[in-house]
């Protein structure tokens, strides 16, 4: 991050300007586009863009492009996060501009939430309807946390994140994280879910799960939640997940498997031996397995570790 005294002073100088401080406060609460920030602070787009560039050059903000938009958020470096957090904690929240900014941000979030809700209700993919087979959500969340808790989650990747459900469960355990989905509408839904859950250290990107733009050995933990039976090539998916996993990193696969005493034909399902085979062929070693029994479908959770020789 800041490698010298001068870099640190430059960052403080960039922050110490009224409009830029407002922008930092907003970006600390989630990912926002230039046009959204322009509407909130009530200034021209060129002026806001200039402020954002100065903050990014100083290492306080970072940005990423998605389609025609550029999103900004506070840099995820822990030193920057600590500095921004300490500054914001001392900021009186009852100032007129702070109140107005927050009201406009809340209004924007409300509009986002409405769009997300309408999309989920009218165009939701069939696989989201399978959530009814999860039974007790608290039990499922607990099983995921137990599966991941033996060691730090670190930098997290959730593949085909959908509504962002896995990010909301595992995200609080992670230092930072990314959810990816090919659908730009599902990215919108997941991004809204993270904002509502107050998880600003997580982000969502539109990506092809078979050809992710992340470098090799980039993540400490990768999750694949209820995706394999809809994947055209699950073997290739697991190999791509392994590529971006650090040596000794962990992959958590969650999948429906047919219940031992199923009361009716399962709508989907996958044979657990196939999952094990795909994991082993990708250079992973299964270290833990948990099964949550159900009436029609069991939920199987498999944790595997990347072998060092595949680094």
PLM feature segments, named:
Residues 282, 291-311:
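Core SAM-dependent methyltransferase catalytic element
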Residues 157, 163-211:
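Class I SAM-dependent methyltransferase SAM/SAH-binding core
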Residues 210-222:
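A short acidic, Gly/Pro-enriched loop at the edge of an enzyme's catalytic core
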Residues 2, 79-128:
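Amphipathic alpha-helical dimerization/coiled-coil segments
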Residues 135-154:
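Conserved alpha-helix/loop element of class I SAM-dependent methyltransferases that forms part
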Residues 221-233:
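A short SAM/SAH-binding and catalytic strip from SAM-dependent methyltransferases
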Residues 235-250:
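A short glycine-rich, Lys/Arg-flanked "PGG" loop and its adjoining helix->strand segment in the class I
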Residues 252-276:
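Conserved class I S-adenosyl-L-methionine
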């Amino acid at each position: 991050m800041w490698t010298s005294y001068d870099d640190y002073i430059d960052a403080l100088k960039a922050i110490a300007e009224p409009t830029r401080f407002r922008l930092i406060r907003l970006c600390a609460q989630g990912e926002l586009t230039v046009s959204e920030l322009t509407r909130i602070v009530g200034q021209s787009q060129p002026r806001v863009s200039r402020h954002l560039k100065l903050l990014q050059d100083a290492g306080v903000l970072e940005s990423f492009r998605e389609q025609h938009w550029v999103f900004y958020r506070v840099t995820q470096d822990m030193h920057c996060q600590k500095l921004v957090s300490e500054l914001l904690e001392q900021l009186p929240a009852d100032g007129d501009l702070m109140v107005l900014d927050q009201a406009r941000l809340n209004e924007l979030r409300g509009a986002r939430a409405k769009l997300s809700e309408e999309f989920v209700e009218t165009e939701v993919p069939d696989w989201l309807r399978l959530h009814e087979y999860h039974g007790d959500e608290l039990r499922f969340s607990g099983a995921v946390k137990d599966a991941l808790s033996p060691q730090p989650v670190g930098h997290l990747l959730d593949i085909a994140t959908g509504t962002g459900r896995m990010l909301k469960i595992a995200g609080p355990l992670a230092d930072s994280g990314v959810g990816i989905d090919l659908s730009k509408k599902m990215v919108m839904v997941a991004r809204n879910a993270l904002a509502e859950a107050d998880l600003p250290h997580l982000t969502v990107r539109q990506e092809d799960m078979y050809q992710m733009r992340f470098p090799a050995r980039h993540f400490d933990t990768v999750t694949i939640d209820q995706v394999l039976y809809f994947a055209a090539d699950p073997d290739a998916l697991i190999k791509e997940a392994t590529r971006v996993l650090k040596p000794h990193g962990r992959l958590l696969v969650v999948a429906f498997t047919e219940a031992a005493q199923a009361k009716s034909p399962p709508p989907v399902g996958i044979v657990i031996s196939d999952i094990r085979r795909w994991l082993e062929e990708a250079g992973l070693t299964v270290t833990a397995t948990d099964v949550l029994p159900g009436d029609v479908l069991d939920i199987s959770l498999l944790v595997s570790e990347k072998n060092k020789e595949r680094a």
